[in-house]
Design a protein with these regions (language model features):
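Bacterial N-terminal signal peptides that target proteins for export
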Residues: 2-19
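Bacterial N-terminal signal peptides
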Residues: 18-29
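Histidine-rich, glycine-flanked metal-binding segment
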Residues: 34-40, 46-90, 492
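Acidic, glycine-enriched loop/beta-strand segments at the rims
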Residues: 38, 46-58, 389-402, 446-455, ...
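C-terminal cap of metal-dependent C-N hydrolases
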Residues: 44, 404-410, 415-416, 483-529
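Divalent-metal coordination cores built from histidine and acidic residues
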Residues: 83-100, 104-192, 211-218, 277, ...
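Active-site neighborhoods of metal-dependent hydrolases
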Residues: 148-150, 158-169, 173-197, 211, ...
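Divalent metal-binding pocket/active-site signature
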Residues: 181-239
């Protein structure tokens, strides 16, 4: 090849490269630009969760974060624009206490999401917990975010079974090791259900020792009080004592006072919690907006009667002297735990007779030819317990107490609900309606809270309590957990006689920037995350 041909080829090569670069530049200019936002909510009334006054603004989401909040944000370039004019745009709601036993099989958690809930805290205090927890967290996919605790009931059952005694030194060391394992695997703290067997057999020394393990990790102590009826004040003092000994923040789940004999005690209970705060303790509580609670029939029996399981109970009942003692104690206990009449106990789940679901103990007495009296009710409860017991709805709370708890400064909201399948079983209506009920009944109808204050209790307050800084408010850079609802239409529809009814007024729910519910339908998306501790190590 001569020199001329080499030079000519080189020039042609340069021209080719120049032309190629030009074509790339032109094609790049013509290609669609990356979306400015993945989702733009326009024209809504923003309540940001901080307690600040509402304002009209657009909310832009990019990825799993809030990208911008402001008036008339640019629509052009947004992948999707949703007009939410006339709707409230708030942070997603936090359910501070619920039961998610079947989450692995029902990750949509539909009855929670349809309430506007984007984060659920599962204490695991009354059921077996997933173990190892880290493997469970890696495997399970769900629509809402979820926070898990080290459940004391499961831990005690694993180590001691149903024994009614204090642990040996070796048993306590084993339980402490199980708490430590759960904390290293992401638990948010220790939870107890001290009203239930076998947790009720644990004394304050045991509970405080286990809480001490969670404290250095930045964990908290959450509890279903040992007693929510006549001994509720002692139960509150015990909870505060655990907090003092373990140097750990304490949270009372579903703060309430049950039993007609104790109605009105909410004032003294709140005064006790306030005095602890004034003394420097970190104390919180959560509430659900119903005057009936739901739990096992075990609650109607003194703990000693149920120790060591069903065979031991049957043996005690067969002994005339022991049975007489039991009957006498239960006659006193009945109005302390439920209402004054047999009709105050409603069956939810009876394993040996599904037809009883929704009926009351009074209905059962009539159907079996017995008088509707306290004496007959106690005998019926014993007979039912011998056949396996039941899960019930106990109408034993006062509306004034519920409102006083709910509106007290610093109180948060919860459902205490179960993960339910629509149309199946007979759940407490709280599983479908707790959060809409607060906004409809206590905000719109009774005006006991402002909308801003209610939203703050449902969003920013629980996030701040747990030290989770990137959730709970609407602000640039926060995780995009968002609930859009109509303040004038939101309402619970579930009732004690017809529980399977969806609430109304929720338009859209997004979790980590992904829409999981919109216009009456679940999208099927499962973007939820397991929460990690936000509080620093102590």
């Amino acid at each position: 090849m001569n020199r001329l041909s080499v030079v000519g080829t080189s020039r042609r090569g340069r021209r080719g490269r120049t032309l190629a670069a030009l074509l790339i530049a032109v094609s790049s200019a013509c290609a669609p630009a990356a979306p400015t936002y993945d989702l733009l909510l326009t024209g809504g009334t923003v309540i940001d969760g901080t307690g600040a006054a509402r304002r009209v603004a657009d909310v832009a989401i990019r990825g799993d974060r809030i990208a911008d909040i402001g008036a008339s944000l640019p629509r052009r370039g947004a992948a999707r624009v949703v007009d939410v004019s006339g709707q409230i745009v708030s942070p997603g709601f936090w359910d501070n206490h619920a039961h998610l036993v079947t989450l692995a099989d029902h990750g949509l958690a539909e009855n929670f999401v349809r309430q506007g809930i984007t984060t659920v805290l599962a204490p695991l205090h009354s059921q077996d917990q997933p173990f190892p927890m880290d493997q469970y967290r890696a495997r399970v996919k769900m629509a809402p975010n979820v926070g898990l605790f080290a459940g004391h009931t499961w831990i005690r059952k694993r180590v001691m079974g149903l024994a009614d005694r204090a642990p040996t030194a070796a048993e306590l060391a084993w339980m402490r090791a199980l708490v430590d394992s759960a904390m290293t695997q992401g638990a948010l703290g220790l939870s107890t259900g001290l009203e239930y067997v076998p947790a009720t057999y644990a004394k304050v020394d045991e509970v405080a020792s286990l809480a001490e393990v969670a404290s250095p990790y930045g964990g908290i102590y959450v509890t279903h009080l040992r007693d929510e009826g006549p001994a509720v004040m002692d139960a509150l003092r015990e909870t505060l004592e655990v907090g003092r000994r373990a140097r750990i923040p304490v949270q009372v789940n579903h703060l309430k006072v049950t039993g007609a004999a104790q109605w009105g005690w909410s004032t003294r209970m709140l005064a006790l919690l306030d005095s602890a705060r004034a003394a420097g303790m970190e104390v919180a509580a959560d509430v659900y907006p119903y005057t009936a609670y739901s739990t096992y029939s075990d609650l109607m029996f003194p703990p000693w009667a149920l120790a060591d399981g069903a065979p031991a109970f049957a043996k005690r009942v067969a002994d005339p002297a022991t049975r007489a003692r039991l009957v006498q104690e239960m006659r006193v206990r009945f109005p302390q735990q439920a209402g004054a009449e047999p009709s105050s106990i409603q069956f939810r789940e009876v394993s040996f007779d599904a037809s009883l679901a929704g009926k009351t103990l009074a209905d059962y007495l009539v159907a079996t030819g017995q008088p509707v009296t306290l004496e007959a009710a106690v005998e019926a409860l014993i007979a039912l317990q011998l056949r396996g017991g039941f899960i019930g709805i106990f109408h034993g709370m006062d509306e004034a107490d519920v409102a006083r708890f709910l509106t007290h400064p610093g109180t948060m909201v919860e459902t205490d609900g179960d993960l339910v399948t629509f149309g199946r079983g007979f759940p407490h209506p709280r599983s479908y309606g707790s959060f809409p009920r607060v906004l409809a009944h206590h905000v719109r109808e009774r005006q006991q809270l402002t909308l801003e204050a209610a939203v703050q209790r449902m969003t920013a307050l629980p996030a701040q309590w747990l030290g989770i800084r990137d959730r709970g408010t609407l602000a640039v850079g926060q995780r995009a957990d968002i609930t859009v609802f109509n303040a004038g239409q939101i309402a619970d529809r579930a009732t004690y006689t017809a529980p399977h009814q969806w609430p109304e007024g929720i338009q859209l729910v997004a979790v980590n920037g992904t829409v999981v519910f919109e216009n009456g339908r679940m999208t099927g998306a499962l973007p939820g995350m397991f929460l990690t501790r936000g509080r620093g190590a102590r």
